[in-house]
C-alpha cells in the first residue's frame, strides 16, 4: 500500500482514520474495532491546546474541534497530516500504549517507516511544535469537565456490522 497516496485521497476524518488503522496494523500488528470519534471544544490546557485525548478503557477518542477547524481554514495543506498525527496518537493509546513518551516515539517510527523522512506526517511526528507550537499532550488520566460531544458519523467503518 502506498500510504502517502492513500492519505492524500482521504476526504474526511473517517477516511483519515482508515489510513491510521491500516498503518497501525502494519507497524505494530494490532487493531481495535468499535471506536467512536467525538468532536468537542476542549478549551485551553495550562500549557497550550490539546489536539485530542482518549478516555482510557473506553471506545471514545475526543478531538478538539477548535484547532481542527482553524487548521482547515488557515493551513488546509496541513489538515490531513494533523488529523493523521492526532488520530494515530490516540489510536495507539486505544491499543494499549498509554505511556506518552512511548506513544510519541511510536507515532514517529510509524510515520517515518510508512511515509518517509520528508513527508509532512513524519515531520509533524518528529517535531509537532514546528507546525503547531501550542499543541500539548495531557497526562493519560486527564479529562476535562463539562464536555459537549459531537459524534462523527461512520467513523470506524470497518467495525460496525454488528450494530443494528
Residue ranges of model-derived segments:
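Active-site recognition of the HExxH zinc-binding catalytic motif
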Residues: 81-98, 104
